[in-house]
């Protein structure tokens, strides 16, 4: 059950980050709206907020980590791919209870559902490089 509720929390965090980037609205307004419309018993609000607010508060650090491993500039990445990468990098660096293989798998699944045809390959490539070269050397 934990994996299902966390998966849904990731999905909601992705949607909230996407809305935040496009609308430039106050991030708390967006999180409140997401919580209000998700009238689902298994919605892990705590994990959603951890991801969503955590990404927003650490976005500069996450960008710094991500940029050297991108095959194109940050502004050339669409909002979905960017949001998926931000969530995954936040989980990799801040959520020690989530194995990195789970983070990669969840990011790829989100990219397959919401991204373009090749988004999941791009996400996998970037995360693989960051994990092997930066986060989990040796």
From Swiss-Prot:
A GO MF term: RNA binding
Pfam families: NusB (PF01029)
InterPro entries attached to this UniProt entry: NusB-like_sf (IPR035926), NusB_fam (IPR011605), NusB_RsmB_TIM44 (IPR006027)
GO BP term (any one): transcription antitermination
Entry keyword set: RNA-binding, Transcription, Transcription antitermination, Transcription regulation
One Gene Ontology cellular component: cytosol
Family indicated by similarity: Belongs to the NusB family.
HAMAP family: NusB (MF_00073)
Reported function: Involved in transcription antitermination. Required for transcription of ribosomal RNA (rRNA) genes. Binds specifically to the boxA antiterminator sequence of the ribosomal RNA (rrn) operons.
Protein name: Transcription antitermination protein NusB
Organism of origin: Blochmanniella floridana
